[in-house]
């Protein structure tokens, strides 16, 4: 019998249908609900136009200006404060780091933007953007390190920096191991 009472209470305590709600609230929410319905329709059309066989596709490229600014700030921080990179190549002054970081981000964004394809959802482009930033950051700190240490002329340092060797990505050489 208790089960029946609970069922009845549940049925009775259900919220009233929308048509029975206050007309004041209904009048206030009506324009909003029409606007929301319009937005839902627009989003549905957009989602349908971007659907792939596996489901809905979200575009992540191009990044927002806020995202680009966050990347820039992180680059400045990495170049101007102590990090794994600075232990090997040294840090830059804040002004220099800002200039270099802006250049790195703009160049990487340009390269990635030129690689945009209409079929891509942006993941490959974002990956390229990230790799370009990493590559250019490493090139710039190597060039500055080589130029400041005097391991050759500035021209030699720039040539070395423009070529990313396979040793950088692979295991450390015997010479690097002995330095560590």
From Swiss-Prot:
Query: Region (Disordered): which ranges?
Result: 1-61, 140-180
Q: Which GO terms describe its cellular component?
A: Golgi apparatus; nuclear outer membrane; nucleus
Q: Where is the composition biased (Basic and acidic residues)?
A: 37-53
Instruction: Let me know which tissues express this protein, per UniProt.
Output: Expressed in roots, stems, leaves and flowers.
Provide ranges: composition bias, Polar residues.
27-36
GO-annotated biological processes: lateral root development; mitotic cell cycle
- Identify the InterPro entries for this entry: WPP1/2/3, WPP_dom, WPP_sf
Q: Where is the composition biased (Low complexity)?
A: 1-26
A UniProt-annotated Pfam family: WPP
Write out the function statement from the record: Regulates the mitotic activity in roots. Plays a role with HSP70-1 in facilitating WIT1 nuclear envelope targeting.
The written remark on domains in the entry is: The WPP domain is required for the nuclear envelope localization.
Which PANTHER family does this chain map to? WPP DOMAIN-CONTAINING PROTEIN 1-RELATED (PTHR34362:SF1)
Protein name per its UniProtKB record: WPP domain-containing protein 2
Species of origin reads Arabidopsis thaliana (Mouse-ear cress)
The record lists the lineage as: Eukaryota, Viridiplantae, Streptophyta, Embryophyta, Tracheophyta
Gene that this polypeptide is encoded by: WPP2
